[in-house]
């Protein structure tokens, strides 16, 4: 599991390098095909996404919860496999969810026509993931009602 304690050692393995333009402790990675750069600012404990990635809220752009490291990793993987930054939305308000209300999902991905087609709800390894998976299997969580 990625945590505040081990992310610094993990990022170079994922292609991140010291930012030449920063006087702070920042590691960054440029995704050539996506034309995007994402960074991790250790001094301020935050994730920095390219401006083309829409962020409806900035709740998950810090180190405060283990799940936010998973969101960051997922965005990096989406860029790595060829999604454009403009296709990625962080924390959009989404209809549905629990008790027929709206909720904020972690990541929304749009297709090439800018139509939403994939929601990604991130969970960190361990109890959070296991608890949520049990809820899905029991039908208590209505992500699948959005289809």
Predicted regions and their residues:
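A short, conserved, highly charged catalytic patch centered on acidic carboxylates
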Residues: 1-147
